[in-house]
Amino acid sequence: METVALIDYGSGNLRSPAKALERAAAGCHASFQVLVTSDADAVRKADRVVLPAVGAFADCKRGLSEVPGMQLMAEGGREYGVTEGLGWIKGEVVKLEPADPTLKIPHMGWNELDIRREHPVLAGLRERAHAYFVHSYRFAVERPEDVIASADYGGPFAAVVGRDNLVGTQFHPEKSQETGLALVANFLTWRV
C-alpha cells in the first residue's frame, strides 16, 4: 500500500482534502493510505505528498520547510510583504488585478480551465472543465512551458503549473467535484 502524506502545517481544515484523496483512490481502485501529518520523516517516506492550499504565502512559507503548494513553488511572493519562495518554478506570486474593475477580489467561484499542454494529471478532463477557485493572488509564471492550464478572471492566470515531478493547482481540487476528483485520481496513479 502506498502512502499519501497530507501536510498539516496548522493552517486550516484538512478533512475535505483527505476525503477527496480517499474518494479518488477508491474510484481508481488504487491502494493508498492517506496520512495527515506534520512529521518531516513521514513526509520524506511518503510515496506522494499533498500540501493543501490554505493560508497566505508568507504564513505557509514560515511554517513549511520542504514540500511546496503551487504558490510556494515560485521564487517569491508579495502577499503580506515580500517572501522568498522555494524557487522550483521561475516566477513570482503577485496580487490578482483583473482588467475589469467590476470583478471582485478574491476571485471566488467556478471558472473554466484552458488546458495549455498535455500532462498525466489532466488526462481525460473534458475540454473547458470547470474548477472552483478562491484566491486574491496569482502565480506569474516566467516560463510559459511551466503552465499546464490557465483560467481567466479579467485576464489569464496560471491555474495548473508543473515541471518534472511537481504539479500545483491554483484551484481547490477537493471542491471542484468531478474535475477535482479526476485530477486527484490522475495524481494518485501518475508515474514519473
Swiss-Prot record:
Keywords: Amino-acid biosynthesis, Cytoplasm, Glutamine amidotransferase, Histidine biosynthesis, Hydrolase, Lyase. Pathway: Amino-acid biosynthesis; L-histidine biosynthesis; L-histidine from 5-phospho-alpha-D-ribose 1-diphosphate: step 5/9. Its main location: cytoplasm. Its EC number is 4.3.2.10, 3.5.1.2. Heterodimer of HisH and HisF. GO terms for molecular function: glutaminase activity; imidazoleglycerol-phosphate synthase activity; lyase activity. IGPS catalyzes the conversion of PRFAR and glutamine to IGP, AICAR and glutamate. The HisH subunit catalyzes the hydrolysis of glutamine to glutamate and ammonia as part of the synthesis of IGP and AICAR. The resulting ammonia molecule is channeled to the active site of HisF. It holds the Pfam family GATase. This is Imidazole glycerol phosphate synthase subunit HisH. It comes from Azospirillum brasilense. It is found in: Cytoplasm. The lineage of its organism: Bacteria, Pseudomonadati, Pseudomonadota, Alphaproteobacteria, Rhodospirillales. HAMAP family: HisH (MF_00278). One of its GO terms (biological process) is L-histidine biosynthetic process. The active site is at residues 172, 174. GO terms for cellular component: cytoplasm. CDD domains: GATase1_IGP_Synthase. Residues 3-192 form the Glutamine amidotransferase type-1 domain.
